[in-house]
């Protein structure tokens, strides 16, 4: 019976097909060992993928679990993605740190608030002063207007008294004050007749009389027939009597 080595291979080496024991090839044994090791590594990676997911590539010099510099910045604030309780606590502490303001910023904010409140109080005070001043000036303006109106009325009364002391004041007053409620066409005609008398020339008497008459038959509102009188006045105007 042939002796066996520790690996169960006959000491004389493997027997060939013709029953002759051959020597082991070192190169073939080395290649077989390398293939076995490679197969073992591939099997380990396959089990790791099934257990924990696909392994991600990490940048050189960065340990696993640190997020990318671009993905970890939002609006200028650094945050950590949480995949577990530890990351959640870290995110909460990060938010607390962002919410807590520095002492200088807090002091500046308080000073700004006090300054704005002072400006608002000053604006309200100035507004009240301006309103009071405007009311006072308006009252003074009304007083001046009333005083000026009273003076104007007094001056008008004095002027009227002096005017009506003149000769023919009634006639002149009616004509010169056209907007006066007592003004009438008859009074204007009377004034014109008086002026014609003062500036009359011989032979124009009947012409001045004709100017005082209305020779339009349609505009006459009188019930009496004055057609004969109109014809006489027209004839005298055209051919006045010679004294």
Swiss-Prot record:
The modification N6-acetyllysine is found at residues 218, 237. Residues 95-157 are annotated as: Involved in binding clathrin heavy chain. It comes from the Eukaryota. It is a peripheral membrane protein. GO terms for biological process: cell division; clathrin coat assembly; clathrin-dependent endocytosis; intracellular protein transport. GO terms for cellular component: clathrin coat of coated pit; clathrin coat of trans-Golgi network vesicle; clathrin complex; clathrin vesicle coat; endosome; lysosome; plasma membrane; spindle. Keywords: Acetylation, Calcium, Cell cycle, Cell division, Coated pit, Cytoplasm, Cytoplasmic vesicle, Cytoskeleton, Membrane, Mitosis, Phosphoprotein. The keyword NAD does not apply. The modification Phosphoserine is found at residues 100, 201, 231. InterPro entries: Clathrin_L-chain (IPR000996). Its main location: membrane. Pfam families: Clathrin_lg_ch (PF01086). PROSITE patterns: CLATHRIN_LIGHT_CHN_1, CLATHRIN_LIGHT_CHN_2. Residues 10-20 have a biased composition (Gly residues). GO terms for molecular function: clathrin heavy chain binding; structural molecule activity. It is found in: Cytoplasmic vesicle membrane; Membrane, Coated pit; Cytoplasm, Cytoskeleton, Spindle. Residues 1-22, 49-87 are annotated as: Disordered. The modification Blocked amino end (Met) is found at residue 1. Clathrin is the major protein of the polyhedral coat of coated pits and vesicles. Acts as a component of the TACC3/ch-TOG/clathrin complex proposed to contribute to stabilization of kinetochore fibers of the mitotic spindle by acting as inter-microtubule bridge. Belongs to the clathrin light chain family. Clathrin coats are formed from molecules containing 3 heavy chains and 3 light chains. Interacts with CALY; the interaction stimulates clathrin self-assembly and clathrin-mediated endocytosis. Interacts with CKAP5 and TACC3 forming the TACC3/ch-TOG/clathrin complex located at spindle inter-microtubules bridges; the complex implicates clathrin triskelions. This is Clathrin light chain A. It comes from Bos taurus (Bovine).
